Amino acid sequence: MNYVNEFNKNSRSTPFLFSYRRCPYAIRARMALIDSEINFNAYEITLKNKPSKFLDISPKGTVPVLIFEEEVIDESIDIMMWAYKKGISLQHSKFENKSIDIGLDLIRKNDNEFKLHLDQYKYSTNYPLKSKEDLRNSCLFFLEILERRLDK
């Protein structure tokens, strides 16, 4: 991983990642690229002052965003899958397809259902119709799923 100061659209032969150091989605994208031994350039954006080139490429304005040749990938799970398919270490060969499917299912549950409930609990004052305890309890389903997986 090479940190760069700007995006160079003429240099598309090396994957380029718009990232943010503390974003968990960007972290897992970087980890997958590194784990797959893919050399890439990373540009750490400032969330309060997003570069216009970044917004031109991905109007959604969220990180991570990977650019390689003419392809733009703006979801961390898709960047992870791209990295493991393209990487020289062929990480997929380490796992059975069933294990990959289980992992992807857990990631999706985390990113969608659990994150929604966790945000409601974290910002409970925005949800006055539910008690903080009820909001907390709504997060437990995911922890129970993880607990069952760990018991296997």
Positions of the model-derived regions?
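GST-like domain detector, emphasizing the conserved glutathione-binding G-site
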Residues: 1-144, 151
